[in-house]
Amino acid sequence: MLWVGTFGRGLLKLNLKGNDINRILLNDEIRYVNGIAQDADGYIWLVTEKDGIYKSIENKIFPNLRFSLWEKSNKNNHYCLHKDRNGGLWFGDNKENILWVNPTTGETVIHQLPPETADSAVTAAILKLYLNSQNHLWIATEKGIMVYNHQTHECIAAQPYTKEFKKITAICEDGDGTMWLGTEKGIHRANCKGKQIKFTGGYEKERNLTPGKVLALYLNNYNQLLISYTDKIIQIDGKEKTVS
C-alpha cells in the first residue's frame, strides 16, 4: 500500500498489487501534510507543517472521512512521523521533543534529549525519525544527524552537516541493516564509527546522473532501495550496495 498526500488537500491510498485507489478529502483546516501512517486498528494519522497531529475519527476508509486534532499534540508545532516495524508511532517536533505512541493501548512516552547525552552540535528542530533493526533511533535535525538509544537515553553517535552533506530529507534501512540517508545533495550510505557517523555518496555519478534532492526512500521485498528525486528515480541493490 502507498499513501500519497496531494496539493489539493486530499489523500490517496494506492494498492500497488491491483488497481484500487481510495480518495479521501481532508478537513479544510488541514494543510501541508508532512507524514501519513495507518495504525494496526485501521485509523489514519497525519502530521502537518504547523497544524499539529490529526487522527481519523473512524477506522474505515471513505471519501468524506473526518479527522480530529489529536489531544496530545500542539497545534502550533511542526511534526514529523515514523511508524516502526512493531506498529509504534514516533513523532518529532520543532521543539526537539520526541513522542512515542502505542496506538492500540494509547500508551505514550516522551523523550526529551538531555544536554548531557545529546550532541549540542546537532540538537535542533527534528525533521525525520527512523527506528532501525538494532532498536536505535536515527534523528535528523536542522543541524545534523544523531543516533539515539531511547532505552538508555544515550547519544550513540552524531554528525553535523557539512558542505558536501546537507539537510536530510529521508531515512531508510536495507535488508542487511545498512542505513541510507536521502539529502538535498543525493543519497548517502551511513555507518557509525565510534561517536561519529561516516557517509558514503557518489551513487548518482555511477550512472552519470547529477545528485539532487531526495524526496523519498522505499525498500521493496527484494532488498532493492528505490530513491525518488525531483526529476528521476534510481535503484540501489541492498546486497551489493551498487546502482542497479
PLM features per residue range, with description:
Residues M1-S244:
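Carboxylate-rich, polar loop motifs that coordinate divalent cations or form catalytic acidic clusters
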